[in-house]
Amino acid sequence: MLKPEGLVVFSKRACPTCALIEPVMQRVAKAVPAFQVVSQDDPKFPSGVANLVDDRELDHSWLNNIESTPTLIRYQSGREAERVVGWDRDGWRRLTGIPDLGDGLPAFRPG
């Protein structure tokens, strides 16, 4: 069950961009209490993240119109307020409020 407030990232281990940003997802999980990862192919990816949702059946992905991973969504009052598709460092920084998130990574990678 997805939380109606906070940040949710849709991810999968088989996605090269998701693998690239695994440390980013781990950092967000530590810094943002209302953060969940919905994993499309491995319920243990990314490692070290407590709030993981197993979406191997893709039910949550379908309901949220996810076309590629990673997709980061900010929910407010139970509704989608904003989304970033792929790794967009500025977009992820804006949604998470972490100003140095992804330092050392490329500025953009498609999902």
Question: What residues fall within each predicted segment?
Answer:
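Short active-site neighborhood of thiol/selenol oxidoreductases, capturing the structured segment around
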Residues: L2-M25, A34-Q36
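Thiol-based oxidoreductase modules, predominantly thioredoxin-like and allied folds used
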Residues: V32-E57
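Short, acidic, metal-binding catalytic loop of nucleotide-sugar glycosyltransferases
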Residues: V28-K30
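Non-catalytic, surface beta->alpha helical segment in thiol-disulfide oxidoreductase systems
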Residues: L63, E67-R109
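Short, glycine/charged-enriched secondary-structure capping and boundary segments
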Residues: E22-M25, N51, W87-D88
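Short, glycine/serine-rich, charged loops/turns that create anion-binding
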Residues: R13-A14, D42, R79, D88
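Short, flexible, glycine/charge-rich loop motifs used to bind or transfer phosphoryl groups or to couple energy/partner
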Residues: M25-Q26, D42-P43, W62-L63
